């Protein structure tokens, strides 16, 4: 899906890591939530409250669950799922565009 219809977009950006990661929240009529964002090059650690699906729209990155030994590479058009109440790491070599879906 390349666009969303009939949604509410929160104007104020979610800013993380001194501005290197920024996203906007998109709310759907059924109560679901997504964020659309950009990550600049860097190494990041994120924690989750709910399960999430990270879809990479452009760029590539490596990711792993905290404590795992192996990094996984993912690129544009691919996605990965993160369990609720967990921590994951990302290595982003160049700007990456993403859509994060929050699973209730």
Curated annotation (Swiss-Prot):
Family membership noted in the UniProt record: Belongs to the nucleoside phosphorylase PpnP family.
Domain of life of the native organism: Bacteria
Organism from which the protein derives: Pelobacter propionicus (strain DSM 2379 / NBRC 103807 / OttBd1)
Gene Ontology terms, MF aspect: guanosine phosphorylase activity; purine-nucleoside phosphorylase activity; thymidine phosphorylase activity; uridine phosphorylase activity
GO cellular component term, pick one: cytosol
UniProt EC number: 2.4.2.1, 2.4.2.2
Function summary: Catalyzes the phosphorolysis of diverse nucleosides, yielding D-ribose 1-phosphate and the respective free bases. Can use uridine, adenosine, guanosine, cytidine, thymidine, inosine and xanthosine as substrates. Also catalyzes the reverse reactions.
Pfam families registered for this protein in UniProt: Ppnp (PF06865)
Protein known as: Pyrimidine/purine nucleoside phosphorylase
Catalytic activities: a purine D-ribonucleoside + phosphate = a purine nucleobase + alpha-D-ribose 1-phosphate; adenosine + phosphate = alpha-D-ribose 1-phosphate + adenine; cytidine + phosphate = cytosine + alpha-D-ribose 1-phosphate; guanosine + phosphate = alpha-D-ribose 1-phosphate + guanine
Alphabetically ordered keywords of this record: Glycosyltransferase, Transferase
């Amino acid at each position: 899906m390349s666009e969303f219809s009939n949604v509410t977009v929160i104007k104020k950006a979610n800013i993380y890591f001194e501005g290197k990661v920024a996203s906007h929240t998109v709310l759907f009529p059924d109560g679901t939530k997504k964020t659309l964002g950009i990550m600049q090059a860097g190494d990041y650690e994120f924690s989750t409250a709910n399960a999430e699906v990270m879809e990479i729209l452009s760029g590539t990155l490596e990711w792993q669950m905290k404590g795992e030994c192996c990094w996984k590479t993912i690129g544009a058009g691919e996605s990965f799922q993160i369990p609720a109440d967990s921590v994951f790491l990302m290595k982003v070599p160049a700007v990456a565009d993403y859509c994060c879906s929050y699973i209730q």
